Amino acid sequence: LTAFVIPVKTGIQNHRKGLDSRFRGNDRLCYSVTMDNNNMKWLVGWAIYLPMLLMFRNGNRMGRRPAHPTYLKKILLTILVFSLMRMIPCLNAEASSNSLTLNEKDTGYRGIWYMNQPSGDEYVYKYSGGLGTYCAKHKPFAVYCDKVKKTFFCYGGTTTDSDRKLLHMVSYYDHKTGMVPRPTILLDKKTNDAHDNPVITVDDQGYIWIFSTSHGTSRPSYVHSSTWPYDVNEFDQVNVTKIENSQEVPITNFSYMQPWYLKGKGFVCFFTRYNYPADRTICFMTSNDGVKWSQWLRLAAMDQGHYQISTASENKAGTAFNYHPKGKGLNWRTNLYYIETEDLGKTWNCADGRKLTLPLTEPASPSLVHDYQGEGLNVYLKDIRFDTDEKPVILFITSKGYESGPKNDPRTWTTARWTGTAWQIRPAFTSDNNYDMGSLYIEDDGTWRIISPTETGPQPYNPGGEIAMWLSGNLGQTWKKVKQLTKESPRNHTYARRPVNAHPDFYAIWADGHGRKPSESTLYFCDKQGNVYVLPRKMTVDFTKPKLLYEKSNVKY
């Protein structure tokens, strides 16, 4: 049993426990409810209890008040039924192969360890480590909501007995109390692939949306929405659809999802579809309610495809991407492109306003920011932001090749800023791996900030390292490392992610992990001053305060 239909009278305000007014038709409510432990007990229990209650009430109306022992037996029988249902394995979400949505509380915060492409050298893999906040093409991982003073976040977690079984996890940091709850296990993705990590967004009603991505087309993708606003205790699976050939059809697969919620306008999503027709075709779609989505728009399909990173404001959405030249394989990624829309995807243009016809299929496109193919350099995308004038700034690394190790140095962190008339491209600093990933902050006073694992870690030339904070006060012309946030770590720190509307007390979140062998992975976050907090791996209470990793500093940067 995966779904049921309940007739409801038009206009009735339903309890949102599995019944959401946003999914209501004219006179019937059709909503998929995952038959997890709680929903099954609720449904079956009431199906048994209500007839008993009606029997008792009818007896009263007819003047035949049931004898006290009989009434007591009915109560005891009801209690027994509910107790037995708790013990039946097939109704337990952990035991049911048909149950997707778990809605269970975990015992702590544990990130997934993942590797890709063994290299047969001292670095062991092309990339690897604690990748609970991987990858750069997944975003956002966290959203700050001022109304409730909480930063909600998701990550790729794992079980207590494995470092490599991917669970989709959701939690929050309470800025009023400084505490975190036990995280919620949303679902088991049935893989060890961190490319299936979840992403998060929050709509203007406060409902938390989790998009469960897939690496390619071999596994299904899912969408969930929180049962209650600003609450992570329970989620409902949403049966999302798109328009295809003028018909509504289910959405069952997407990759590298990047959902953004625009206040008063709805959702915009950048994502990838494999073999559509390019190996990695980058796409775009919109939705007013998160349920019914527009027709998929192919943005670009040059040669073997692309990776993209996107951003959105109230007025526009933009994406930067590279491309895979034909015949060279997906490890060769080069060039830098940028396009944007100011009307929710109806029209698209370059940064200079020139209109584009999509999909883009030729590498010599007017959207080209810089020709790195001609320089023999790979391009690894990291982050993108709009500045205070809503002009794009792109953060990326260039290197000589895909393999780990010094032979492909320098790995140069670079910014590309649209000035209004031209792209201004400036080197920032270097690190030792193509998959070192950090976030760019453009603050109201004009400060540019990067929080990233640029410092050599315990596993040199593997992804990540020690986290550092860099500042620029002149639009990226020069950078100063103002603080090293971690030091003498046993494992490399990786993928520092910026929350949407980042609050100074929760400014970045990341994970650690060994760069050359499977290991445990711990999650961390830092404040704007660079103080690092550890999310607890084991919790014996429902709420706790994360511990400082080092002595707190009040120096402001």
Where are these regions (language model features)?
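Intrinsic disorder/low-complexity segments
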Residues: 1-97
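Extracellular, repeat-based ectodomains that mediate carbohydrate processing or recognition
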Residues: 97-557
